[in-house]
Regions:
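Aromatic- and carboxylate-enriched substrate-binding clefts and catalytic-loop regions
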Residues: 104-289
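An acidic-aromatic substrate-binding cleft motif
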Residues: 52-94, 98-102, 106, 110-111
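Hydrophobic side chains in beta-strands
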Residues: 33-35, 75, 260
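Residues at alpha-helix termini
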Residues: 13, 19-21, 97, 141, ...
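N-terminal accessory beta-strand-rich subdomains and adjacent acidic, glycine-rich linkers
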Residues: 1-55, 59
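Short conserved micro-motifs at the rims of enzyme active sites and ligand-binding pockets
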Residues: 44-45, 83-85, 270-271
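A generic structural signal for short, non-catalytic loop/turn and secondary-structure boundary residues
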Residues: 7-9, 26, 66, 141, ...
């Protein structure tokens, strides 16, 4: 679903696309489309739409912890992948003094490779920091809650996971890295086990689960019946993956925050994510609103 404004005729053109995975049989479906024609402000219409979403039992939003509404520092804008302990701790002290309450350690914690690629994603071992748990405790001692970043769909060709799950990808031709196929239960279990282990081993407060929208059909994605898959639909498999991750992480810490970005938020994503970011827009007050 989307909309765009056309200056030439002063109209807003809307579109709704159905059956984007039209590769397998569908017996029945139903949908509800809300069109708000009231003369009210845009923000009020959105607020009322969110309340409407919440009426649907299968779209009940996740619990939102207090920390999700507090200022958060992300290392991406300052460091990109080039993370260094002492500089990071200095930034944490400064952030705390300015009123920040949490930090997301973004891309770079999992590898010493600074080439802004995803060749080594998939294993998620903290190569850069000898004792990542100790670093997390140091940051917590400063007074910040700590979450870490994962590019959920990607499995780099230089990772051990790539060899382990060979043949279980939606595509191997993505510009960043091969994309896991969540229709395989072992893929979902593997990914969730990584997050659960990290939460326990490092005493984490949250996760940034990135690139969820790259779980989709690609030109080379197979929809042929396969005994190893327990879903035909990619969307339904992603729903199962994220629900499983959310449930397991909140068993460890009921106040766990799970961050998504606006590009792939919506009524379904509110079931799992409880911290929603506008986009990659540092220093942009308008976009951040």
């Amino acid at each position: 679903m989307g909309a765009k404004y056309r200056e030439e005729d002063d109209f807003i053109y809307c579109k709704v696309t159905l059956f984007t995975e039209c590769k397998y049989a569908i017996q029945n479906f139903n949908m509800e489309l809300r069109v708000d024609r009231r003369k009210i402000g845009f923000s009020q219409a959105l607020q009322d739409t969110a309340a409407w979403w919440e009426r649907f039992e299968n779209l009940s939003p996740a619990y939102v912890p207090v920390i999700a509404k507090k200022p958060l520092y992300s290392t991406w804008y300052q460091f990109h992948q080039d993370l260094e302990v002492q500089k990071l701790l200095e930034e944490c002290r400064l952030a705390k003094s300015l009123g920040f309450e949490s930090i997301i350690i973004d891309d770079g914690w999992q590898t010493e490779d600074n080439n802004r690629g995803y060749d080594f994603t998939g294993d998620w071992e903290s190569e850069r920091f000898a004792d990542f748990g100790h670093l997390v405790n140091q940051i917590r001692d400063i007074g910040l809650k700590v979450g870490i970043w994962y590019s959920v769909p990607f499995c780099g060709k230089k990772s051990k996971a790539y060899q382990k799950f060979k043949g279980k990808f939606l595509t191997e031709n993505h510009r960043w890295a091969p994309v896991f196929d969540p229709r395989y239960p072992e893929i979902r279990d593997y990914l969730v086990s990584i997050y659960v282990k990290a939460a326990k081993d490092w005493n984490l407060d949250g996760f940034k689960l990135d690139f969820i929208d790259d779980f989709k059909a690609y030109p080379d994605t197979s929809f042929e019946p396969h005994n190893g898959r327990d879903f035909s639909s990619i969307n339904e498999a992603v729903d199962a993956l994220l629900m499983q991750a959310s449930v397991e992480l909140k068993k460890i810490n009921p106040e766990m925050f799970i961050e998504f970005r606006q590009k792939y938020t919506g009524p379904a994503m509110r079931k799992y994510g409880n911290m929603l970011r506008a986009f990659d827009c540092p220093g942009d007050a308008v976009m951040n609103r």
